[in-house]
A protein has these predicted regions:
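RNA-binding accessory domains that recognize and position tRNA/RNA substrates
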Residues: 1-168
Length: 168
């Protein structure tokens, strides 16, 4: 499991034939904003940018918030697409979140899944249901489901790798 920063960008996809120009400009601006972090890698894949190989997450996120065209930034975990591995990682991320809350607090949650890789054996709804069930089994006294206004929103994206995060 590797820490990454997931970057979503705006309406570049609507620009038609100019799209490559705008994507290159955004990539250049992202790299320029991170020039004081020489070991950082910026990767573009499937409509997202990913920042890898970093140490100072807060400073990098702060630098990225100043880049025009970025819609949202999420600290995330990148891992393989094996469902058991994914479930264990979601449990671990949830445990970290719960450890930051008072022990007697019941936290409402929701699992949201997006499956860009349509060859993945489970659809988005099944991924959300199974991971949600696993979390309820793991933390029955700490979690309750609330799909409308949850305290914790566990996000799962299945792409070339699996990505999990809870901050958007």
């Amino acid at each position: 499991m590797e820490r990454v920063i997931l970057i979503r960008y705006g309406e570049i996809h609507l620009k038609g034939q100019n799209r490559p120009f705008f994507e290159k400009a955004l990539h250049k601006n992202i790299k320029n904003s991170l020039r004081s972090f020489p070991d950082v890698k910026v990767i573009r894949a499937q409509g997202r940018y990913y920042v890898e190989n970093y140490e100072d997450e807060a400073s990098i996120i702060d630098a990225l918030t100043r880049v025009f065209g970025i819609v949202s930034i999420s600290p995330a975990y990148k891992l393989g697409k094996d469902f058991d591995l994914l479930g264990a990682a979601v449990e671990q991320m949830t445990a970290t979140y719960l450890a930051q809350r008072p022990a007697d607090t019941i936290v409402s949650f929701k699992v949201e899944s997006r499956r860009a890789d349509k060859t993945y054996p489970l659809n988005s709804m099944d991924i959300s249901k199974k991971l949600g069930s696993r979390l309820l089994s793991a933390y029955p006294d700490r979690l309750k489901v609330d799909v409308h206004d949850p305290d914790l929103r566990v996000n799962v994206e299945i792409r070339e790798h699996a990505y999990i995060y809870h901050q958007v």
